[in-house]
UniProtKB/Swiss-Prot annotation:
Protein's name in the database: Cellulose synthase-like protein D5
InterPro entries per UniProt: Cellulose_synth (IPR005150), Nucleotide-diphossugar_trans (IPR029044), Znf_RING/FYVE/PHD (IPR013083)
Ranges annotated as spanning the membrane: 312-332, 343-363, 966-986, 991-1011, 1038-1058, 1082-1102, 1116-1136, 1146-1166
Classification of source organism: Eukaryota, Viridiplantae, Streptophyta, Embryophyta, Tracheophyta
Sequence ranges of Low complexity compositional bias: 48-59
One GO term describing the cellular component: Golgi membrane
Function, as annotated: Involved in stem and root growth. Possesses xylan and homogalacturonan synthase activity.
Knocked-out gene: effects: Significant reduction of root and stem growth, xylan reduction in stem and increased susceptibility to the cellulose synthase inhibitor isoxaben.
Record organism: Arabidopsis thaliana
One Pfam family recorded for the sequence: zf-RING_4
Protein family membership: Belongs to the glycosyltransferase 2 family. Plant cellulose synthase-like D subfamily.
Active site residues of this protein: 443, 884
Length: 1181
């Protein structure tokens, strides 16, 4: 259909000329069934492949009888058949001229653009009100409900009503370039009686639709890719002067360097820069015609900088490591050559333990030789990707999309309010709204989580604009309103206090609604179940014709949604097909994808709590996902849930980058995503597989009794690994490159050959190899290679795709799109390299339709991963309870690099278990995963040559550190054995032994001080880490070794309970109440035994020495010193057993004292000291 830009369309009439069958054109719900137009003109671009792979749901699939409690079957096969068999009509529009019986109404008929927007709006409302379910042996169904929780009218929320006071008519479209919204009647009033001036800018109206340049400007807004500068033809009418600098010849067109030639001196407007440079910079180099100033120099600056640790700190640090290594070698040599002949067994055990400790220290210390710091420049990021340029005249965001994954499994242990606050912080993050999508994985399939997310989506319409308007930090409402500081600091808007009070009141009501959901769901389900039971009994009585029924009616105790239909997920009664491990897959788009253009709100009124007239009120897409679970299928815990999210997001939004967060880790710094993208989009960023942020925790007791902050690991070890090949993946707070998760290799890698990998060989991994071994990693093909490569390599690669990724064609088609969108722009990579043109992502996202969601249902089915490589080489890796470490190891093993991003303001914050038992179980799970890694093919011993040597040492230490606990337990008991037996690990305290011991201790202390210096941690944090290393090494780590050996040898499966997340304390409650709760566990037995044995041994040793006529004080001092060293490390454990301060059970001290006295007297009686006297004799009566 051809449309003129200047013609009016008051009454178009569509005339059907010829019907045709099987054309395959797709209906958009408009008057003319034209095929969808794509804004991408490059047919070879992967961005055009997604438009051809989608199918849509016809409007006839949705029932029009208003029966919302019914299921409407919409299988993928039906959708495909319906789409391909749809009729295509050739139509054109006849414009009827105005007549007396047909008056022209200027704005009564909506334009085609408005019709399309209306269709998209209806599609969004349909998607956000429909639950899609499906799975094994069941068709995909769309259950239409109202899940908006009384959400406000989007037209009124978005300000689509007249802005003149007293008028609430709908705005047809803007009549003035200032953007002032006005309805048809008010517009006519302004034209007739208002002098024809706009009420907003007071300028005369000009009909925008009559402007012949409007259509051309709309075409420019599409930001189409331009041809290369070498192929473009310059205007012959212009005389230009071209710079000969090599660095600008491959870049974008620069307006400041191609200007009209003139002889006048008008500042920077001249095309010819004089030789004297106008007196600027003429001192050196001879700035003449060839070196005009670099006006775009800021945009060419790097996004990141690597800052090495000062040489005044790192050089002595490395020297001390070498000195301590020499001292350890001399000490161990002396120990081996000078055995204790009087107690060889004691000498042998101690020497073996010391040798192992030396090896463990060396493996832990070597990866710390090259620590680095990194800085980002957000100003350059904004200028490069969000500023107007030739390919992006409107300055739309050219940043790639990010899909945020939030995982939860049990609403009882992970409170819905905590998850809701995390979701709110994500929705309010400072990142382009249209480029962001949030996915919540509910692995428990609980209705409580579903309805809590619906409530969160409703409250987000108030919270997110409030954060954007007043620049709120942090954007977690619970954390923000709970801050104990002056909230007026740096706030300049006059309405801030009033609006903060309103939002705070609304949030308190939101918390009440969330906390009352469990009881509301229970009461609702009980009422519906009673009603169903009565109906069943009534039906039975009617069938029995009034006779007494002999069989009891059994009605399943279902869980009911608010619209009176069964919840397709987990029921509280745990019925078949509706239990925690047996339920259908569920997808619900709570918030549909936003429009590409900003939508501004309205003034504060009864429905709008805050004034949002100048605030973008769009919200990112929010999706609820619960993968299908069936008996007989291994669901692989969290790793399986994350892989289901990877496939779902690839079909629905396909962001080239993925952020993974736990449900209790919220975004504390709204700029965190931008800082992470600086590394991904900078030069060399195509080799980065993920950007890991440090974990920071809230709710920890001020003394950090159990080293919950873990700063030694996050600020020392991880920062040091950043100087090698990159930090490890720790399970949350990590931005991934999607193609790296798919198991592809980086575009370039370095292999390390020779002794300790000192000889480097750079290789290119872009092209796939025809001959690949079974265990070889997959190389990433160039765009279009799947379908257009004519050689055998491309055919082999295409045949392997279903085996690797599954049988979803939509998912496979999304892979090259994600790879293309994640590329670097040509300014950094160059024309001939694998890059994308600037502005290629500044285009609107394709609308989400129901057929796409139906396809997403199929990829979360329980059988989709069968006979594929998901969990083996693709996605999160299965087979270990610490799937995060294994996943990061696989990426580094392929040659990828990772980055550690430490921001000035913490990027993310979460919670950690402060209870002793919970903390020990958390450490037990980590250590068990390490043992599994040690006995698997993921052991760093079998790493490829693409992994650096020191990086391999770090990964090997991850798998080996739990075995240190066996030697640590023995070494902690040795002082007690020494005191009991009267012997020591050395025959005598020789001066050489003391010198070696002193040198080892001093070098360790100096190393610790230097680590504190370059990492920024405190001495208190370092000491707490040392204490908990002993506590964990004597409790959780040996249990992990035992469990790991049972799994490897006997095949015993290991299962762990989910770590409970504490919710926010109410007013008046003790924030650290859980710290003093004593929960008994078998893990407490070994350290408790060590403590009691050492205390008794000290008493026995003192008694023997005091009563001996020939006391050996040297052995006593050595034994007591080492026993005291053990007890000092176990002091936090003992304090945790005592409970709350001031409430220490007296019986503990009484029995401990009595037991120590009795054991001491019994030892003296059984083994009396030599030379005893009669008055020292003790006899039982």
């Amino acid at each position: 259909m051809v449309k003129s830009a200047a013609s009016q369309s008051p009454s178009p009439v569509t005339i059907t000329v010829t019907p045709c069958k099987g054309s395959g054109d797709r209906s958009l719900g408009l008057t003319s069934p034209i095929p969808r137009a794509s804004v991408i003109t490059n047919q070879n671009s992967p961005l055009s492949s997604r438009a051809t792979r989608r199918t849509s749901i016809s409007s006839g699939n949705r029932r029009s009888n208003g029966d919302e409690g019914r299921y409407c079957s919409m299988s993928v096969e039906d959708l495909t058949a319906e789409t391909t068999n749809s009729e295509c009509v050739l139509s054109y529009t006849v414009h009827i001229p105005p007549t007396p019986d047909h008056q022209t109404v200027f704005a009564s008929q909506e334009s085609e653009e408005d019709e399309m927007l209306k269709g998209n709006s209806n599609q969004k409302s349909f998607l956000s009100g429909t639950i899609f379910t499906g799975g094994f042996k069941s068709v995909t169904r769309g259950h239409v409900i109202d899940c908006s929780m009384d959400r406000a009218d989007p037209e009124k929320k978005s300000g689509q009503i007249c802005w003149l006071k007293g008028c609430d008519e709908k705005v047809v479209h803007g009549r003035c370039e200032c953007g002032f919204r006005i309805c048809r009647d008010c517009y006519f009033d302004c034209i007739t009686s208002g002098g024809g001036n706009c009420p907003g800018c007071k300028e005369p109206y000009r009909d925008i639709n009559d402007d012949p340049e409007t259509e051309e400007e709309d075409e420019e807004d599409e930001a189409k890719p331009l041809p290369q500068m070498g192929e473009s033809k310059l205007d012959k009418r212009l005389s230009v002067v071209k710079s000969f600098k090599a660095q600008n010849q491959a870049g974008d067109f620069d307006h400041t360097r191609w200007l009209f030639e003139t002889k006048g001196t008008y500042g920077y407007g001249n095309a010819v820069w004089p030789k004297d440079g106008y007196g600027i910079g003429s001192g050196g180099g001879g700035n003449g015609y060839e070196t005009p100033p670099e006006f775009g120099e800021r945009s060419k600056r790097p996004l990141t900088r690597k800052v090495s640790v000062s040489a005044a700190i790192i050089s002595p640090y490395r020297l001390l490591i070498a000195l301590r290594l020499v001292a350890l070698g001399l000490f161990l040599t002396w120990r081996v050559r000078h055995p204790n002949r009087e107690a060889m067994w004691l000498w042998g055990m101690s020497t073996t333990c010391e040798l192992w400790f030396a090896l463990s220290w060396l493996l832990d210390q070597l990866p710390k030789l090259c620590p680095v710091n990194r800085l980002t420049d957000l100003g350059v990021l904004k200028e490069r990707f969000e500023s107007p340029n030739l390919r992006n005249p409107k300055g739309r965001s050219d940043l790639p999309g990010i899909d945020v994954f939030v995982s939860t499994a049990d609403p009882e242990k992970e409170p819905p309010l905590v998850t809701a606050n995390t979701i709110l912080s994500i929705l309010a993050v400072d990142y382009p709204v249209e480029k962001l999508a949030c996915y919540l994985s509910d692995d428990g399939g609980a209705l409580l989580t579903f309805e809590a997310l619906a409530q969160t989506a409703s409250f987000a319409s108030t919270w997110v604009p409030f954060c954007r308007k007043h620049n709120i930090e942090p954007r977690n409402p619970e954390a923000y309103f709970g801050q104990k500081r002056n909230f007026l600091k740096n706030k300049v808007r006059l309405d801030f206090v009033r609006e903060r009070r309103r939002v705070k009141r609304e949030y308190d009501e939101f918390k009440v609604r969330i906390n009352s959901l469990p009881e509301a769901i229970r009461r609702r389900s009980d009422a519906y179940n009673v009603h169903e039971e009565l109906r069943a009994k009534k039906k039975q009585m009617e069938m029995m014709m009034g006779n007494n029924p002999q069989e009891t009616v059994i009605v399943p105790k279902a869980t009911w949604m608010s619209d009176g239909s069964h919840w397709p997920g987990t029921w509280s009664s745990g019925e078949t097909d509706n239990s925690r491990g047996d339920h259908a897959g569920i997808i619900q788009a709570m918030l549909a994808p936003p429009n590409a253009e900003p939508v501004y709100g309205a003034e504060a009124d009864a429905e709008n709590l805050i004034d949002t007239t100048d605030v973008d009120i769009r919200l990112p897409m929010l999706v609820y996902v619960s993968r299908e679970k069936r008996p007989g299928y291994d669901h692989n815990k969290k790793a399986g849930a994350m892989n289901a999210l990877v496939r779902t997001s690839a079909i629905m939004s396909n962001g080239p980058f993925i952020l993974n967060l736990d449900c209790d880790h919220y975004i504390y710094n709204s700029m965190a995503l931008r800082e992470g993208m600086c590394f991904m989009l900078d030069r060399g960023g195509d080799r980065i597989c993920y950007v890991q942020f440090p974990q920071r925790f809230e709710g920890i007791d001020p003394n950090d009794r159990y080293a919950n902050h873990n700063t030694v690991f996050f600020d020392v070890s991880m920062r040091a690994l950043d100087g090698l090949q990159g930090p490890m993946y720790v399970g949350t707070g990590c931005i991934f490159r999607r193609t790296a998760l798919y198991g592809f290799s980086p575009p370039r890698a370095t292999e390390h050959h020779g002794w300790l990998g000192r000889r480097k060989v750079k290789i290119s991994l872009r092209r796939p190899k025809a001959m690949m071994k079974k265990d070889d990693e997959v190389s990433l093909p160039i765009n279009g290679e799947y379908n257009e490569e004519e050689n055998d390599d491309g055919d082999i690669e295409s045949l392997l795709l279903p085996k690797r990724f599954g049988n979803s064609n939509s998912f496979v088609a999304s892979i090259p799109v994600a790879e293309y969108q994640g590329r670097l722009i040509q300014d950094l990579q160059g024309k001939g390299k694998n890059s994308r043109p600037a502005g290629s992502l500044a285009v609107p996202r394709e609308p989400l339709d129901a057929a796409t969601v139906a396809e997403a249902i199929s990829v979360i089915s329980c059988f989709y991963e069968d006979k594929t490589e998901w969990g083996k080489r693709v996605g999160w890796i299965y087979g270990s309870v610490t799937e995060d470490v294994v996943t990061g190891y696989r990426m580094h093993n392929r040659g990828w690099r990772s980055i550690y991003c430490v921001t000035k303001r913490d990027a993310f914050r979460g919670t950690a278990p402060i209870n002793l038992t919970d903390r020990l179980h958390q450490v037990l799970r980590w250590a068990t995963g390490s043992v599994e890694i040690f006995f698997s093919r993921n052991n760093a011993i079998f790493a490829t040559r693409r992994m650096k040597f020191l990086q391999r040492v770090a990964y090997f230490n991850v798998g080996m550190y739990p075995f240190t606990s066996l030697f640590l337990i023995v070494y902690c008991i040795l002082p007690a054995i020494s005191l009991f037996s009267g012997q020591f690990i050395v025959q005598s305290l020789d001066i050489t032994f003391l010198i070696y011991l002193l040198s080892i201790t001093l070098t360790l202390c100096m190393l610790s001080l230097l680590e504190i210096k370059w990492s920024g941690i405190t001495l208190h944090e370092w000491w707490r880490n040392e204490q908990f290393w002993v506590i964990g090494g004597t409790s959780a780590h040996p249990a992990a070794v035992l469990q790991g050996l049972l799994k490897v040898i006997a095949g015993v499966d290991i299962s762990f309970t989910l770590t409970s997340k504490s919710s926010a304390p109410e007013d008046g409650d003790d924030e650290f109440a859980d710290l003093y709760v004593v929960k008994w566990s078998f893990l407490m037995v070994p350290p408790l035994t060590i403590m009691m044995v050492n205390m008794i041994a000290i008493a026995v040793g003192l008694a023997r020495t005091l009563y001996s006529p020939f006391p050996q004080w040297s052995k006593l001092v050595g034994g007591v010193f080492f026993s005291f060293w053990v007890l000092c490390h176990l002091y936090p454990f003992a304090k945790g057993l005592m409970g709350r301060r001031g409430r220490v059970p007296t019986i503990v001290f009484v029995w401990s004292g009595l037991l120590s006295i009795i054991v001491s007297l019994l030892w003296v009686y059984i083994n009396p000291p030599s030379g005893k006297q009669d008055y020292m004799q003790f006899q039982f009566p």
